[in-house]
Amino acid sequence: DGIHGIWFDYNKAYEILKHFAGIITPDFSLFSDFPLPLKWWNIYRMRAFGFWCTTLGINVINNVRWNNDTLDICYQGIPKNGIVAIGAVASRLKYLKNRGDFEQYFINMIEELQPHTIIIYGSTNYACFKNLWTSGIKIVSFPSRRNKKKADAGDAQ
């Protein structure tokens, strides 16, 4: 069922999730070619799933996903001065043409939410992440499968 299984079969999801100390909310896509209501729906689903887990006593770290169309709502429901997670893989940062917008939105997210810790899935080998090391924001990174394969091959990014 993939990521949608947790939304449509939430009781089964709970039976699995209750065994963990906490979760990162799901990363429902906000592709640029999605209609705006679908982007809003996916942001809603991320926050609603996190809220539901919180009501069940599960610790929640909010995943943050944004694009130009959703900056007015993408941070709603996420506590300030906390821990957030982002995915660098789906952001397509490896392509130079995507980095400018990503960095702008990333800075906007930091200003808006003022997180003390950011969990990053994917490579942190980009200027916007390296600048955070001196800002006092803790960065916790988890390499993607691709990054792990490259590291194993001796060609880490």
Predicted regions and their residues:
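Eukaryote-skewed repeat-based solenoidal scaffolds used as protein-protein interaction platforms
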Residues: 4-151
